[in-house]
């Protein structure tokens, strides 16, 4: 999760789910991600002390800015830890992992196609 550098949780090395009690967790809306849908259902069922705010499917700078400005907590990926200078990323102790892949255009140029094929071959 990401929080503003001034957030009460910002000094923690790792978060427990109970650290999120009383917080608003920003995450993609239902239907955008199977893993996030499972996490949302779990939080709504077992941890109702955490409020959830829907974000667009693809985070843009406005989502990161909103997190920094509101003091909300943003569900984010470790690989995005340096995307916004006003936020820090802290891992959470839970059993949810987001699979990550390659993002590329539907009709990519030839060099991108060759790269994707090389990655596919390496993954086999």
Regions found by a protein language model. Name each.
Residues 114-124:
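Bilobed periplasmic-binding protein/Venus flytrap-like ligand-binding cleft at the lobe interface
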Residues 28, 48-60:
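Short beta-strand-to-loop elements that line the ligand-binding cleft
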Residues 25, 48, 71-72, 124:
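Generic structural signal for secondary-structure transition and capping sites
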Residues 10-13, 38, 84-87:
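Short, charged, surface-exposed secondary-structure boundary motifs
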Residues 1-30, 97-108, 120:
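Hydrophobic/proline-rich hinge and linker segments of small-molecule sensing/allosteric domains
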Residues 17, 22-47, 112:
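Secondary-structure junction motif
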Residues 61-110:
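Beta-alpha-beta core module
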């Amino acid at each position: 999760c990401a929080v503003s550098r001034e957030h009460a949780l910002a000094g923690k090395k790792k978060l427990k789910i109970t650290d999120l009690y009383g917080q608003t967790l920003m995450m993609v809306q239902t239907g955008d991600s199977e893993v996030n849908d499972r996490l949302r259902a779990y939080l709504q069922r077992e941890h109702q002390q955490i409020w959830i705010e829907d974000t667009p499917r693809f985070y843009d700078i406005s989502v990161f800015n909103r997190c920094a400005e509101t003091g909300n907590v943003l569900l984010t990926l470790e690989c995005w830890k340096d995307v916004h200078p006003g936020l820090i990323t802290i891992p959470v102790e839970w059993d949810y992992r987001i699979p990550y892949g390659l993002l590329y255009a539907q009709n990519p140029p030839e060099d991108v196609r060759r790269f994707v094929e090389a990655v596919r071959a390496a993954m086999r």
